[in-house]
Every structure is written in structure tokens, then in C-alpha cells.
């Protein structure tokens, strides 16, 4: 059975790093890998969503840039020496708020795991997690999230930390993914 994995990207080095990490993590598994780019035309996404309509010049230009960026990412993956035929890459370009787009794709494509970078294209060196990564970790409750640190090596983890206050009840499905990843990596789980 193929896994459905979501890789949000803003075309930053950090998101590319997370894509490579995901490919390495699931190199022995058959996967549908959805590469998502959420576009807008201006830095203020509220103005962008209000002012952009399909067919408008602003919308079409932003969508074209997004689709071109996704095509470049897929080309970069295809040209890698360790290109894996077990992986099917599906690009998704959409106009939305990043968190809402991620939630929609998780639901529509039956996503089992989100793997993303910690910081986006305009990430500050003083910030550990970008705002999108933080929102996804906090707000996406029906799908596990792996956030790959900017300087993480492309080696798989030997230890997985599971932080808990013991007040939250976790579903078996949520814990199964962590156990599966621990098995893939031959890693210990520390609570």
C-alpha cells in the first residue's frame, strides 16, 4: 500500500532540505508524495486573497510562478542520482492561506504524514520555527507532522523524542506513525 505524504514548499533552501529528508526517510517505501505550494501575489496574504480571482492577471501570474517553481522542484528530484521509482510526485499549486491549504490537502488526499521545513523563504536566523510550521504543528490535529530543522543532517534519527504532559489522549493511528518511523530508522523513542 502506498503512503500519502505531503511536502509543503515555498521553494526555500529549508523546504528543499525537508524534501530530501522525506525522500531519504521513505526511500524503501512506495509513496505518493504531494508537493504543495501555496501562492499569493502580494506579501499581505489577506489583500492577496481578496484581490485575486481566477482569470485576473495577478492571479494567473502568481499561479504560473507557483507552477514553474513546482516544475523546477520536480526536475531537481528527477535529476538526483538516487531518484526512487517507488515514489510518485504530485505537484499541487493553490491560492489560499498556507494553513488552510495544508488542512484541505490532508483531508482531500488522505494524507498520512506532513514533512516540512522549520523556516520559510524569509526565515530569520533568530527564529527556530517559522509561523507556518508553528501553525501546522499546533492546528493540524488529524495528521502527524515532522518538522525538519534547517541544519539537520540527511541521516535518519537515532532517537525520537515524544514530548507529553500525559494529559492528552493520543489516537493509535497517531502513535503508529511514530513507531513506524522509529522502526524505519532503528531509533529509540524517548518519552
Describe every region a protein language model picked out.
Residues 1-56, 159-191:
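Small/aliphatic-rich secondary-structure junction motif
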Residues 21, 65-76, 101, 174-177:
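Short, solvent-exposed amphipathic alpha-helices that sit
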Amino acid at each position: 500500500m502506498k503512503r500519502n505524504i505531503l511536502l509543503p514548499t515555498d521553494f526555500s533552501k529549508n523546504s528543499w532540505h525537508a524534501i530530501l529528508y522525506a525522500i531519504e526517510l521513505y526511500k524503501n517505501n512506495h509513496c505518493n508524495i504531494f508537493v504543495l505550494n501555496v501562492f499569493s501575489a502580494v506579501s499581505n496574504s489577506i489583500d492577496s486573497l481578496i484581490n485575486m480571482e481566477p482569470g485576473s492577471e495577478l492571479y494567473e501570474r502568481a499561479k504560473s510562478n507557483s507552477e514553474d517553481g513546482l516544475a523546477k522542484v520536480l526536475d531537481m528530484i528527477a535529476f538526483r542520482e538516487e531518484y526512487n521509482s517507488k515514489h510518485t510526485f504530485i505537484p499541487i499549486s493553490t491560492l489560499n492561506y498556507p494553513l488552510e491549504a495544508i488542512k484541505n490537502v490532508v483531508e482531500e488526499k488522505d494524507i498520512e504524514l506532513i514533512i516540512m521545513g522549520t523556516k520559510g523563504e524569509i526565515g530569520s536566523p533568530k527564529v527556530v520555527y517559522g509561523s507556518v510550521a508553528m501553525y501546522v504543528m499546533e492546528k493540524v490535529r488529524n495528521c502527524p507532522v515532522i518538522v525538519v530543522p534547517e541544519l539537520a543532517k540527511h541521516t535518519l534519527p537515532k532517537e525520537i523524542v515524544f514530548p507529553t504532559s500525559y494529559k492528552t489522549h493520543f489516537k493509535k493511528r497517531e502513535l503508529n506513525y511514530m513507531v513506524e518511523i522509529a522502526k524505519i530508522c532503528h531509533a529509540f523513542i524517548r518519552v
